[in-house]
Curated annotation (Swiss-Prot):
Pfam families linked to this entry: Toxin_7 (PF05980)
Tissue: Expressed by the venom gland.
Organism annotation: Agelena orientalis
Propeptide stretches in the record: 21-34
Residues bearing the modification Leucine amide: L69
Subcellular location: Secreted
Entry keyword annotation includes Cytoplasm: no
Cellular component terms (Gene Ontology): extracellular region
Top-level taxon in the UniProt lineage: Eukaryota
Origin organism lineage: Eukaryota, Metazoa, Ecdysozoa, Arthropoda, Chelicerata
UniProtKB keywords: Amidation, Disulfide bond, Knottin, Neurotoxin, Secreted, Signal, Toxin
Protein name: U2-agatoxin-Ao1j
Length: 70
């Protein structure tokens, strides 16, 4: 009986470790996507920082809105 319980616990631990890897990769992709700028209207992505798509700099207009300076 102890062997069966131990085997189930080990299987659950291995499965949770395998399932966690794709989730971390998905989080990494979404963080990378956040770094870019929006291509339309030369507006910066809210989380892009000082970068813009065309090499211009972003100017924050508010917490959610910023625009590219020429």
């Amino acid at each position: 009986m102890r062997a069966i319980i131990s085997l189930l616990l080990i299987s659950a631990m291995v499965f949770s470790m395998i399932a966690a890897v794709p989730e971390e990769e998905g989080l990494q992709l979404s963080e990378d996507e956040r770094g870019g700028c929006l291509p339309h209207n030369r507006f910066c992505n809210a989380l892009s920082g000082p970068r813009c798509c065309s090499g211009l700099r972003c100017k924050e207009l508010s917490i959610w809105d910023s625009t590219c300076l020429g």
